[in-house]
Amino acid sequence: ADKAAVDSMRSELNNLEMKGQIVIGEGELDEAPMLYIGEKLGTNNGPEFDIAVDPLEGTNFAANNLPGALSVIAVAEKNSLFNAPETYMEKISTKITEKNVIDLDYTVKQNISNLSDYLNKKPEELTACILDRPRHKEIIEELKKLKVNLKLITDGDVSGALLVTDEKYNVDIFLGIGGGPEGVLAASALDAFNCNFQCRFLFKTEKDKERAKKI
């Protein structure tokens, strides 16, 4: 499924009148044969663009014929998309754009309290979306203590962040730790929806720090 998505996306991008370059893709040149970081795409005529892609987010969804898989592309002017390294990021997304309501520096309890006050909802009327991962155990336990409704997702770092964009999804906040490249893709989409997305790197090892310094 992933190969089919890569092949199709690359073929279509190469048909566009542009000078495109992958800044977030399937990996470095030695890691991926196509849609690798630095690969040139397009007809080599027209405007210059940075391109960030995730040809298939939610591979397991697609493989099992389940809803939730996405093909994600962000295109922007040259030198305007951040080439995020393959490291973890702390993330929060909401529809609230006012300052000092939701912040990565706040505790989960403080963010939920602020969200509750701002939306005029009780904590038990709020819904938080988070990836169902062992690394989120403490956050999930805290949300349960606060009686916040949980939407646990098995995959979909980008799609999870986008659930705050429309009331039909009934998600007030997305939070947790996910991939850096996925953070850039989510930020690009959420900006178009005039939503609030905050992220910062969470380096687990010295190797992660060194990788980030090279970007």
Positions of predicted regions on the chain:
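Acidic beta-strand-loop-alpha-helix segment within the catalytic core
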Residues: V72-I153, I215
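DPxDG-like acidic metal-binding loop motif
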Residues: G46-E57, F61-F82
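General beta-strand structural signal in soluble alpha/beta enzymes
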Residues: I22-E26, I51-V53, A62-N64, N83-A84, ...
